[in-house]
Every structure is written in structure tokens, then in C-alpha cells.
Amino acid sequence: MTTAPDSPPTGSSTNPSTNPSTIPSTNPPATLYAVRGGAAWITLNRPDQRNALSAALVNELDAHLSTAIADPAVRCIVLTGNGPAFCAGADLKSPPGQVIDGRQGVTLADVLAHIQDAPKPVIASINGAAFAGGLGLVGAADIVVTVDAAPFSFSEVKIGVIPAVISVVCLPKLGLHHGMKLFLTGERFNGNRAVEVGLAHRAVPAEQLAAAVQAEIDAICAAGPIAVAECKKLVRRVPQLTRDEAFRETTAWSTRMFLSAEGAEGMAAFREKRKPSWVKS
């Protein structure tokens, strides 16, 4: 499996607010960060280790998420991998959450929650193999586009452990039916099957991955930023409510959005047959 042509940007952050002191340094860096066209690209950068989730990598990933969330130029966040794999899972020699230089590391649970709670959409661009803990990133992401031939596996049972933490973000997508079989067997499946079982939204040939991800970025950038953030909350909130609670809460929610400045601008733009202010010309 190879990365798609027109690979994501691999430079350091273009955001001047990034504070290097908040990110433990590794040489080379375990992640890469760049902003392009409204998207912050966070690239897992341990290709020789198949982008395994080390303590340093997860610390950097978490810090980059905070940078992207705080940057008004960033409308969405893209997670991808450098090299032939997306992410092979946790690094068993230096697992996430390990103490580094006397500081407690960010746990896998912490970073998955950070992805889900981010007010900006997180897109997973699956360029290659996604195994075990790496599937936690897939489960936590809001939109998932994958190479059709990329191999997936909840492989934990093969070494006598279980996909415990990542089940929290993967089971809501898989459901009990698919989750049970995939967790029990650790079987491999490809990107097309990932779409069928609910882990991914779209599977494309490798050479089409960049364009497919860009289409998602463009769609998000065309939408109101506050509306997008509220939609993330909406999708997670409604299933927690009873039917009557949901109707009451969403009716009030809808009213707030229609009366908001962003809602007024969007409706005015529609009436005047122009682009709303948040769409860059």
C-alpha cells in the first residue's frame, strides 16, 4: 500500500500561534502539521514504525489539535499517515500516556475525546493499514475517507488483549452485530468493507484519495462555521434524549440558530443570490 499522489502537506505549522514548547520534541518529529486551504493537516510521521501511537506521537497529536481548534483560519482538521500505513496501533514499547521528562503523557482516551469534542470537523484520510489502536482515530473522526484496498483489523485478540478503549468510539459506528464479529476474530477487511460496516464513509482508489478528501474539505468550508460546530453537538446529543426531550430541545436549538447572526447572513445571502461571508472567493 502506498500513499496517494498529491500527498498532504508535510511542513511545520503555518500558524504563528503554535508554541513549540508545548510539544515534546522528537527528531524527526512524530507528527507533521500544516494548514492549507482552510484545513489543518496532522500527519502521523513514524513511517518506519507504521505510524504506531507512541507517547510522543499522541502528545504531539493532542497539541496540534489544540492549535487547529484555536486557529480561526482552520475550518476542519485532517488526520493522515506518512508512508504505507495510516496507523498500526499503539507502540507497545512507548505506549500513549507514558511519563516523558517527568510529565504525564496524554492517554489514548484523552486524544480520542479531544477529537470527538473538537468544535471543528475531523476527517480521517486513511492512506493505508489501520490496525488496533489506530482504528480508534478512525472511530473518533467525524468523516472517514479511505483507500479501498487499505487493510483494517481489530487485531488485539491476536496478542491476547482486547480493543477496550477504542470500543468506546468504534462500537457506536459498528453496532453490536459487526462489532462482535470483528472484535472476536481480529479478521482483516478492506476499505470497501469498512464502508459497509460503518467505519468509513467512502472508499476510493489510492490515486483518488487526495481529491476525495479535498471534496469533504470544500463542503465544510462552504458551510457556516457555527452551524458546523452545532451539528457536531447535535449528532451526539439527540441519541441521548427521549423523543419528547429531543423535540423540545431541538425546537429551541433551531430557533436559536435561525435568530443567530450566522443564520441571518446565510439567509440573506440566499435571498440575494450571493455567497455568504464565510465562503472565501
Task: Go through each PLM region and give its residues.
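Amphipathic alpha-helical segments at domain termini/boundaries
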Residues: 2-6, 26-41, 45, 188-220, ...
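Short alpha-helical scaffolding segments that buttress acidic/His motifs in well-ordered protein cores
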Residues: 182-183, 231-234, 250, 254, ...
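Glycine- (often His-adjacent) and acidic-residue-rich active-site loop
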Residues: 81-115, 130, 241-242
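Terminal peptide-recognition signature
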Residues: 42, 46, 60-61, 79, ...
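Conserved CoA-thioester-binding segment of acyl-CoA-metabolizing enzymes
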Residues: 1-14, 18-82, 113
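Conserved hydrophobic/aromatic "anchor" residues
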Residues: 65, 86, 152, 270, ...
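Crotonase-fold acyl-CoA enzyme core
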Residues: 113-226, 259-260, 264-268, 274
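Charged catalytic carboxylate motif
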Residues: 56, 60, 107, 114, ...
